[in-house]
Amino acid sequence: MGNVIITNSCNLNCPFCFATETKCNDEIKFQHMPLDEFRSILKFDHNVVTNLCGGEPTTHPKFTEMLEELLSVRGKYINVLTNGTWSEKVRKYIAGLPFEKSKRIVYLFNVLQPDMYTEKQKNRLYAALDAVNPETAFIGFTIYKYPFDYSYILEMARTFGIRRIRYSIAAPNIHDSAAFQIDPAQDFRELADVVYDFIMDARALGLEVNPDCGSLPPCAYTPEQLADLMLVKPGLKFNCSAVVDIAQGGEAWRCYSLYSIMKANTKDFSGIQDLTEYFNRRTRLLADIDILDECRECEHKRSGLCYGGCLSYHVIAAWKKDRNYSFFPIDNDVELLSSIPHLDYKVLTVWEKSPDETIVYVRRDQQLQTKTLRNDPVFLAFIKACDGKTAMKNIIENLAEYFNNSEEATAEVMAMARLLFDQYSLHLGTALASPLQQHMSPKRREAHEVL
């Protein structure tokens, strides 16, 4: 499920906005997605749920027509991510929808502190909140500083009968230093107190709290706070996966924070799942970069439970050390040769079924489905050579006996590395990325040693 960015127009100027690279301004012109292109994207992303985003999606001149098209599809559901300052046309349209249609639209109202609105904007927001079925609405807000007064969120939920709240931790636009409002080393702990207090207060009022973007790492909380928070459903999350934003021209990016470094185009992919997997694989390379010194030896990082905070902070941390750092060596032959491959034995299994047969397969996230990979001698030799200490270029030299010449060795070994990477079985160590060696069971280690 992707976010369809139907417009880059927005009628607010939020202090924590991370969409500044695409938002229309004096240098970037308005881009309202044409209806024909909107329909094409719906074919590319044919999920049962479609997310409409911006900018502010309701500023699109064809917004209501887009809703009508989606509602005409049997079984289609819609999420609208909005600031709620709707025009009278949009408000009347939504208020007038029959229940059979309105129940298929969910609204996430991202709201600011009351003193950040003009009187007109505030009246529009309250009118929008009053126009929707509270059961289909979330109130969302972003914590971008501390101390942070969230009492207005609880009051707004009470006033409009909305029971579900989503919170985010502000994430910077990596090219806009004005958005660097949070320093992980200094601010994560204080922000964790804000999150904890908010969740406890909301829970006491019977509200459902859902985490959104910008998760904090477990180490930001005290053990006592974590114990309390783990009892609150749906609970905390310490990592994220690609949702994928798709805009005009088929331009797609993993998320707004990573807009400038992780982009693609829908024309190069078979569908939304293919595109999402492309981004998710490369996400792991960013997650391997340490934000804090403590991350290097962290068991939560080892297990994949925690990324250490928003991935944009990983990028910033790397650029502070090397402005020319290559984040995705898997896509660059020269960088790949210099990297150190690490196998992920939570995903990859090497099973010596018998003295004459070794089976190599992958199974992700405790799924029932497996995929069998190659088990020829050179592939098994490559797996054994990936010891987390040896660079790719040295592995190629060590496996030279299997090939006719160095060019063939280089091409084949890099192809094997990319095969394992595409199956979520390979991490790449670099000067700034330190994927930890996964713990192996005795049987797995024994199988690895006998290769």
PLM features: what roles do these ranges have?
Residues 190-225, 251-307:
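C-terminal accessory region of radical SAM enzymes
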Residues 327-355:
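Hydrophobic packing positions characteristic
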